[in-house]
Curated annotation (Swiss-Prot):
It comes from the Bacteria. This is DNA mismatch repair protein MutL. The keyword Secreted does not apply. One of its GO terms (cellular component) is mismatch repair complex. Belongs to the DNA mismatch repair MutL/HexB family. HAMAP family: DNA_mis_repair. It comes from Rickettsia prowazekii (strain Madrid E). One of its GO terms (biological process) is mismatch repair. This protein is involved in the repair of mismatches in DNA. It is required for dam-dependent methyl-directed DNA mismatch repair. May act as a 'molecular matchmaker', a protein that promotes the formation of a stable complex between two or more DNA-binding proteins in an ATP-dependent manner without itself being part of a final effector complex. Keywords: DNA damage, DNA repair. The keyword Transcription does not apply.
Length: 595
C-alpha cells in the first residue's frame, strides 16, 4: 500500500473525531470562544438536542472579514503566541475547534467587529468555504451549525437519545456558567427556554453565591461551607457541602482550574481524603470549587477537549485542596443538614444555629479537635449500674441551659434518644449515633497522640474462626494490629489467641470483635497499606465502642455526652452519615397549638 498525504478535509475530520464527540462538544467549544471574545451575554439555541441545529450568539468583540477568513482554518488562533505556550489564560488555544466543526457540518458564521460599519458572513459545508459576503448583524458573533455529522454519518450511530444529548449540553452550559457569574446565559431548546441566567456585577463572593443558587439551588448553599484559602501562588474559593448533606454519586462535584471545568482524578481523590473521617465510602460531597493557579504550573494541553490537566507539583495541589476543605468544614463542624427530616416533618429546624466547638484546635491537618482535659466540669463516667429509669423526667440541672449549646438533658426515651432543652428550642439526640462519633474522635485522637493504651486480658481469649484463610489473614497483619493496641498470636490452624485489646473499648466482646475483624479484612487486607488498614480497623472498633450506647443513662451521663459533643468538631453526624441530633425551635412547636 502506497504512503500518501491526507487531504485537508480528511485531516479536519480526524481532528473533529478527537474534539467533537457529540452536540455538547460543539456547544462547549463555541461558548468558550464567545467567552474568550469578551462577551457579556451568550445565547444558545438547540433543535433536536443540537443534532439538527446549534446556534451560539454573543456580544463579544467580533471579527473583521480578514479575521473571519483565517478563523475557519486549522491551527489559527488569536489567543496564543509561541512564547505563551506554557502561560495560557484563555479557554481556546489549539486553533482546531471551528475548522473541526465545519468539517462535519453545515456552518454559517456572521460577525461584526466592535465599532465597525459592516458585518460579514461566511458559509462552510463539510469544510468547503464559500465566498465571504457583507451581512447585517449587531456587534458580536453568531455561529450556526446545522446537520452535525452529516459528513461523517457513521458518527451518528454513536449518539444517544435526544434527552441524553440535551442533558449533556445543559450540563456543560451550567458548568461554564458557574465559572462566569458576570456573563448572562440563555439556553433555548425547541423554542422552550431551559436556562436563563442573569449576569451579576457585584463582588466575587456574592456573584458566585447567586450563580450557584441559580444553577444548583439554594438548598446546596444552605448546607455548604464557604472556602477562601490562599497561598503565594495558589488560591481556592467556592462552596463544599457539610458532611450530613451528601449524595450517592459524584455528579454534583464541580471542579475548576483557572475557571476551566475539569474532571481530574487527583482532585477527586483529594475530596475523598478531606471527607474520609465523615463520609462512608459510597457517599460523596457536593461542591463548587475554583482553583486559581499560576498557568505556568499547570499544563492544560493534555487532552484535545482540554478536560484534563497535569500539575507541576500534584502532591502540593492535593494537600492544599485537602487543607482548604478541612478549614472550611471546621467553621461549620456542628451543623447538621437543613434538609434532614424537612420532607417528613416541617418542625425540623431548617436554619439551625451554628454551634462552634469550644476548646477546639481548628488546624485542618489534625484528625480531630476533641478536648480530652481531665479537669472539665463533665467527664465520661464509667459504665456501671444505672439507677435513672428510662423516660423519667430529670430534675432541672443547677447549671442554666443558656450556658450550653446543646442545652441541659431533661429525659431519655426508649434508651435511645436524649431530650435536652436550650433557651429557645428542644434538641433530640440519637445517643448511639453520638457515641459512635465520640468513639471515632477518641480513637483517632489516641492514635495520633500515641495514647491508644493496651489492656492486658486477665485470661487470654481463644477465638476460633470459620476458616484458616481468616486466621492467616489476621496473623499476617499482627504487627499492624499491634500498633492498634491489639495483640494476637496464632493458635492452631483456624484459631487466634488474644492477649491485649485497646483499653478504650472497655468490656468488649472479644469473640465478636475478632470475628468482625477477620470478616472485614480477609478479602483485601493482604499487602494493605497501614493507613488504609487503620481506617478499616477503627471503624470496627467504633461499632464495638458504640454498642454500649443503647442503654439507660443517668442525668450526669447524658449531660456529659452533650458537653463532649459541644467540644468535638463534626458532631452533627455519625460515621454512617446519620445526623446525631435534630433541633425543634419553640416557635415551630407553638404553631402546632394554634387554631
Amino acid at each position: 500500500m502506497t504512503i500518501k498525504f491526507l487531504s485537508e478535509s480528511t485531516i479536519n475530520r480526524i481532528a473533529a473525531g478527537e474534539v467533537i464527540e457529540r452536540p455538547a462538544s460543539v456547544v462547549k467549544e463555541l461558548v468558550e470562544n464567545a467567552i474568550d471574545g469578551g462577551s457579556t451575554k451568550i445565547d444558545i439555541i438547540l433543535e433536536r438536542a443540537g443534532k439538527n441545529l446549534i446556534i451560539v450568539s454573543d456580544d463579544g468583540i467580533g471579527m473583521t472579514d480578514k479575521e473571519l477568513e483565517i478563523a475557519v482554518k486549522r491551527h489559527t488562533t488569536s489567543k496564543l503566541n509561541e512564547s505563551d505556550f506554557f502561560n495560557i489564560h484563555t479557554f481556546g488555544f489549539r486553533g482546531e475547534a471551528l475548522a473541526s466543526i465545519a468539517a462535519i457540518s453545515k456552518m454559517l458564521i456572521t460577525s461584526k467587529k466592535r465599532e465597525a460599519d459592516k458585518a460579514f458572513q461566511i458559509k462552510l459545508i463539510g469544510g468547503n468555504k464559500q465566498q465571504i459576503t457583507v451581512s447585517v448583524h449587531n456587534e458580536g458573533t453568531k455561529i450556526e451549525v446545522r446537520d452535525l455529522f452529516f459528513a461523517t454519518p457513521a458518527r451518528l450511530k454513536f449518539l444517544r437519545s435526544d434527552k441524553t444529548e440535551l442533558a449533556a449540553s445543559i450540563d456543560i452550559v451550567k458548568k461554564i456558567a458557574l465559572a462566569h457569574p458576570r456573563i448572562s446565559f440563555n439556553l433555548i431548546h425547541d423554542n422552550k427556554n431551559l436556562l436563563k441566567l442573569k449576569g451579576q456585577n457585584k463582588d466575587s463572593e456574592t456573584n458566585l453565591k447567586q450563580r450557584i443558587i441559580d444553577v444548583i439551588g439554594d438548598v446546596f448553599i444552605k448546607n455548604a461551607a464557604y472556602i477562601d484559602f490562599k497561598t503565594p501562588d495558589f488560591s481556592i474559593c467556592g462552596y463544599t457541602s457539610i458532611p450530613t448533606y451528601n449524595k450517592a454519586s459524584s455528579e454534583d462535584q464541580f471542579l475548576f482550574i483557572n475557571n476551566r471545568p475539569i474532571k481530574d482524578k487527583l482532585l477527586q481523590v483529594a475530596l475523598r481524603v478531606a471527607y474520609q473521617d465523615y463520609l462512608a465510602r459510597d457517599r460523596y460531597a457536593l461542591c463548587v470549587i475554583f482553583l486559581q493557579i499560576d498557568p505556568q504550573l499547570v499544563d492544560v494541553n493534555v487532552h484535545p477537549a482540554k478536560a484534563e490537566v497535569r500539575f507541576h507539583d500534584p502532591n502540593y495541589v492535593r494537600n492544599i485542596l485537602i487543607e482548604a476543605i478541612k478549614n472550611a468544614l471546621t467553621n461549620k463542624s456542628q451543623i447538621t443538614a437543613t434538609t434532614i427530616g424537612s420532607d417528613k416533618n416541617s418542625l425540623v429546624n431548617k436554619e439551625p444555629t451554628i454551634h462552634k466547638a469550644t476548646n477546639v484546635n481548628s488546624k485542618a491537618s489534625e484528625y480531630t479537635s476533641f478536648n480530652f482535659k481531665r479537669n472539665t466540669a463533665y467527664h465520661t463516667l464509667p459504665y456501671g449500674k444505672i439507677e435513672q429509669e428510662v423516660g423519667k423526667c430529670i430534675e432541672h440541672n443547677n447549671q442554666s441551659h443558656k450556658q450550653y449549646k446543646f442545652g441541659v438533658a431533661k429525659a431519655q426515651l426508649h434508651t435511645t434518644y436524649i431530650i435536652s432543652q436550650t433557651e429557645d428550642s428542644i434538641v433530640i439526640i440519637d445517643q448511639h449515633a453520638a457515641y459512635e462519633r465520640l468513639g471515632y474522635a477518641k480513637i483517632k485522637y489516641c492514635l495520633k497522640n500515641g495514647e491508644l493504651v493496651k489492656q492486658r486480658l486477665l485470661i487470654p481469649e481463644i477465638v476460633e474462626l470459620s476458616s484458616q484463610k481468616k486466621a492467616d489473614c489476621l496473623y499476617e497483619n499482627r504487627e499492624k494490629l499491634f500498633k492498634l493496641s491489639l495483640t494476637i498470636e496464632k493458635f492452631g490452624e483456624k484459631s487466634i489467641i488474644v492477649t491485649e485489646i485497646p483499653n478504650i473499648l472497655g468490656d468488649v466482646n472479644v469473640q465478636k470483635l475478632i470475628q468482625d475483624l477477620a470478616d472485614h479484612l480477609s478479602d483485601f487486607a493482604k499487602n494493605m497499606p497501614l493507613k488504609e488498614l487503620i481506617e478499616h480497623v477503627i471503624k470496627i472498633y467504633i461499632c464495638h465502642y458504640s454498642i454500649r450506647a443503647a442503654r439507660k443513662l443517668s442525668a450526669d451521663e447524658m449531660n456529659s455526652l452533650l458537653r463532649q459533643m459541644e467540644n468535638m468538631s463534626f458532631s452533627a453526624q455519625c460515621n454512617n452519615n446519620r445526623p446525631t441530633y435534630i433541633e425543634l425551635k419553640l416557635k415551630d412547636i407553638e404553631l402546632l397549638f394554634r387554631l
